[in-house]
């Protein structure tokens, strides 16, 4: 059907055939696809068209005539408004199957790869998994509140709890909000640039139980700062209270200055027996239980004997590097963020791992230089951002020819693209293992190992 034969605000009946990568249902009217949030495959629904483009349109679900067996009642009271989760209406088994199918379909469509995609490694309990809460502060109905933004807006939802946040961190956000309100702290107003408090962040260390509270403010002076700190320490079991100062009129959460107001500068957590010092701004995986699962896949794929030189591109604070260093001859890590490299060096020292070298820079610039200087990896690990590996880095890998490339990915599309380049260059992959790091969302992590033929 031509889009011109359909009209905005028209109600249509259709059957949902599939889910898109962002979890929307897909149904067709005479071959013309409509994307409908919250609809599930197999459901017959009535939907109202909200937008029409030449080749596809969008609609809002009005009624479900035939309900999917995978549909569940979302337990979160603000799920329909909040932008934090997108799959609470799909059973957890259904979410795991959706993520596996996304990886398999992407491998075939983008990578032209016929690889095994086993079942997604999920969680026994897919709730309360996040060790970091980061919420904006604002006025809602004249009172100070802290919560996530409403979908596609910067309106804050007044929420009493978040079911994917660790309970200790969740309680800390609510207590902090109450204490700030008690002292009349003025929330930051994006439109005027006025106000004192921008965000509340909490970090919780799963293995030690340590808690950090971060107050992101517009200036160093915070009215009733001493009283706020006193109340926080009286009411919460807290290890560290930190202030970050961000005076800029921007959507970026953190400013350049961070100072410890009370307690320790860091909290400490462990992954696979490796200790990590985590500061307010450290990059650290947000799901500690699944991080162990993800890293175990990487460790198993590397098959280290103690004789190997390992290069870890995009190494962050050294979390994978240090787990591998226990079993490698030497590990070299590179990361563009200098603070992360400083953290990686400190974490290596904390664990008495002397067989590590960390350097600040772009992986695609530093690794070719290492290669020129005679550093050749037996195993090369990549854990790139969503955009995948830089082309120059892939060219260096193909020139260096490490026996194995262990690829940890947060984007199946760029993983498939990069795997295609590496397989055309002489590597072979047999399987891609999806890991569910972010239940109730559409985000997918996956691990594969490419072996030189």
Curated annotation (Swiss-Prot):
Coiled coil: none
Pfam assignment, any one: TRAM
EC number, UniProt record: 2.1.1.-
Every TRAM domain range: 5-63
Enzymatic class: transferase
GO molecular function, one term: rRNA (uridine-C5-)-methyltransferase activity
Protein name as it appears in the record: Uncharacterized RNA methyltransferase lin1863
Active site positions, chain numbering: 410 (nucleophile)
Chain residues that bind S-adenosyl-L-methionine: 285, 314, 335, 383
């Amino acid at each position: 059907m031509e889009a011109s034969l359909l009209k905005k605000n028209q109600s249509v009946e259709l059957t949902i055939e599939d889910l898109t990568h962002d979890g929307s249902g897909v149904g067709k009217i005479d071959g013309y696809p409509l994307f409908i949030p919250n609809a599930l495959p197999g459901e017959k629904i009535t939907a109202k068209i909200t937008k029409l483009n030449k080749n596809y349109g969008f609609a809002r679900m009005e009624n479900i005539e035939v309900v999917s067996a995978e549909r569940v009642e979302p337990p979160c009271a603000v799920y329909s408004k909040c932008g934090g989760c997108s799959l609470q209406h799909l059973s957890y088994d259904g979410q795991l199957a959706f993520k596996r199918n996304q990886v398999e379909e992407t491998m075939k469509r983008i990578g032209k790869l016929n690889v095994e995609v086993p079942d997604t490694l999920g969680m026994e309990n897919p709730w309360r998994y996040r060790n970091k809460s980061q919420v904006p502060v604002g006025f809602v109905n004249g009172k100070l509140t802290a919560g996530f933004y409403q979908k596609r807006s910067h309106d804050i939802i007044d929420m009493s709890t978040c079911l994917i946040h660790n309970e200790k961190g969740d309680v800390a956000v609510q207590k902090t909000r109450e204490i700030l309100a008690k002292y009349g702290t003025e929330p930051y107003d994006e439109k005027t640039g006025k106000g004192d408090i921008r965000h509340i962040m909490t970090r919780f260390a799963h293995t030690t139980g340590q808690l950090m509270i971060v107050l992101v403010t517009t200036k160093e002076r915070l009215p009733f700062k001493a009283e706020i700190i006193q109340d926080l320490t009286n009411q919460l079991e807290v290890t560290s209270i930190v202030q970050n100062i961000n005076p800029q009129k921007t959507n970026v959460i953190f400013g350049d200055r961070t100072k410890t107001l009370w307690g320790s500068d860091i909290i400490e957590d462990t992954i696979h027996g490796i200790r990590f010092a985590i500061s307010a701004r450290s990059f650290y995986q947000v799901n500690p239980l699944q991080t162990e699962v993800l890293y175990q896949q990487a460790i198993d794929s590397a098959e280290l004997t103690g004789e190997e030189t390992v290069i870890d591109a995009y190494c962050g604070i050294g979390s994978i590097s240090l787990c591998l260093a226990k079993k490698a001859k030497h590990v070299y890590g590179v990361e563009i963020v200098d603070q992360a490299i400083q953290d990686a060096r400190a974490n290596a020292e904390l664990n008495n791992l002397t067989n590590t070298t960390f350097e600040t820079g772009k992986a695609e610039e530093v690794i070719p230089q290492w290669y020129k200087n005679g550093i050749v990896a037996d195993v090369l690990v990549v854990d790139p951002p969503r955009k995948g590996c830089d082309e120059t880095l892939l060219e260096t890998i193909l020139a260096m020819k490490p026996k194995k490339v262990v690829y940890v990915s947060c984007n199946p599309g760029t993983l498939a693209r990069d795997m295609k380049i590496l397989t055309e260059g002489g590597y072979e992959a047999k399987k891609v293992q999806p890991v569910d790091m972010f239940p109730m969302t559409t985000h997918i992590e996956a691990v594969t190992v490419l072996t030189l033929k």
